[in-house]
Amino acid sequence: MAGGELWAEESRRVEVHDVEHDSGSWALTWTSAVTNRRAEPLRFGSPTTAGREMAGYTGLFWRGPRAFRDGRIIGPDGEGPGLMASQSPWLALSGEHDGADGHATVVFEHAPANDHTGAGGSHPAHWFVRNEPFAGIAPSWAFFDELELAPGDTLTRGYRVVVADGAWEREEIAKYLRTHPW
């Protein structure tokens, strides 16, 4: 509420599933539905839409531990920090643990209903991802352009986050996502 006026209502659902002790992986799905309750449009932006170059984070954001600095950024068709602002169904970051001989991989995947490319008429999403000066991933729906939500409209977005022991390769990630459908 702003000045006593209700601007928006959100319904959020978080579920943990696909816990696999053998592979050391588990998944979390996160779904949010925000409804504009104002009589005028709501505008969602990012630091990039406000003029700060390549800082287009919005929505769900994961900031990794210090150990993931300089971690490996992996996408379906590429690798590295150059995937910042790219579009793809999923993106992963793999890093080495501090003080232990081990790695972990975190995979973010758009829900099929997200229309993340905008091909179906939705506002397109781009990945905010970095491994320096900190590790972070956000499937940003207002990276380059503000998203306008009309009065009474609802913005629904869903994501799956997979957390896995080990430094997974692109093929392992793709296989996991194929064999664990939404």
Descriptions of predicted regions:
Residues L28-N36:
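Short, well-ordered beta-strand segments enriched in hydrophobic/aromatic residues
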Residues T35-A39, G166:
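Short solvent-exposed strand-capping/beta-turn motif centered on an Asx-Ser/Thr pair
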Residues W7, S25-A27, A55-Y57, T154-T156:
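A general secondary-structure signal for short beta-strands and their flanking turns/coil
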Residues D18-T29, F61-R63:
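Active-site loop segments of alpha/beta catalytic cores
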Residues M1-G24:
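Extended, loop-rich substrate-binding clefts of extracytoplasmic carbohydrate-active enzymes
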Residues V107-W182:
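Beta-strand-rich recognition/accessory modules
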Residues R12, S32, R157-V161:
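A structural signal for short, well-ordered beta-strand segments
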Residues P41, G45-H116:
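Active-site/ligand-binding surface loops and adjacent short beta/alpha elements
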